[in-house]
């Protein structure tokens, strides 16, 4: 099996969260933007609309966010576990299992305000968190 086919097969096994992280790392590593249009459509998209020469096309604003717990420092586990338990509304014995493999989405499809609040609580406890 060729290297390309092996990579494709491995990509098929990724979760959405892992795929999102992969895209982010590819963008950072190679200095590209995965949301940028490719091909002949670039010329058309770059032309201003007839009604307003200065009007730029507005990007659709994201309304739902995921709070991703990326890292828990060993010396701050207890405090972070308490916050994770409260945010995820899970039992004490489930917290360690939940945080066993990171990064992991702690909250999914929540408002920006809720995501920011959860991120702040986790960061205050010492966790490394990002909102996607």
UniProtKB/Swiss-Prot annotation:
InterPro entries: Ribosomal_bL12 (IPR000206), Ribosomal_bL12_C (IPR013823), Ribosomal_bL12_C/ClpS-like (IPR014719), Ribosomal_bL12_oligo (IPR008932), Ribosomal_bL12_oligo_N_sf (IPR036235). GO terms for molecular function: mRNA binding; structural constituent of ribosome. The keyword Ribosomal protein applies. It is found in: Plastid, Chloroplast. Keywords: Chloroplast, Plastid, Ribonucleoprotein, Ribosomal protein. One of its GO terms (cellular component) is ribosome. One of its GO terms (biological process) is translation. Transmembrane segments: none annotated. Coiled coil: none annotated. Homodimer. Part of the ribosomal stalk of the 50S ribosomal subunit. Forms a multimeric L10(L12)X complex, where L10 forms an elongated spine to which 2 to 4 L12 dimers bind in a sequential fashion. Binds GTP-bound translation factors. Forms part of the ribosomal stalk which helps the ribosome interact with GTP-bound translation factors. Is thus essential for accurate translation. Belongs to the bacterial ribosomal protein bL12 family. This is Large ribosomal subunit protein bL12c. It comes from Tetradesmus obliquus (Green alga).
């Amino acid at each position: 099996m060729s290297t390309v086919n092996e990579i494709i097969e491995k990509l098929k096994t990724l979760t959405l969260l892992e795929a999102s992280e992969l895209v982010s790392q590819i963008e950072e590593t190679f200095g590209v933007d995965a949301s940028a249009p490719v091909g002949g459509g670039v010329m058309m998209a770059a032309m201003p609309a007839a009604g307003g020469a200065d009007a730029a096309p507005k990007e659709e604003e994201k309304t739902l966010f995921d709070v991703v717990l990326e890292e828990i420092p060993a010396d701050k586990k207890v405090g972070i576990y308490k916050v994770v338990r409260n945010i995820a509304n899970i039992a004490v014995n489930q917290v360690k299992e939940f945080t066993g493999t990171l990064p992991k989405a702690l909250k999914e499809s929540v408002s920006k305000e809720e995501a920011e609040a959860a991120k702040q609580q986790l960061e205050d406890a010492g966790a490394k968190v990002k909102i996607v």
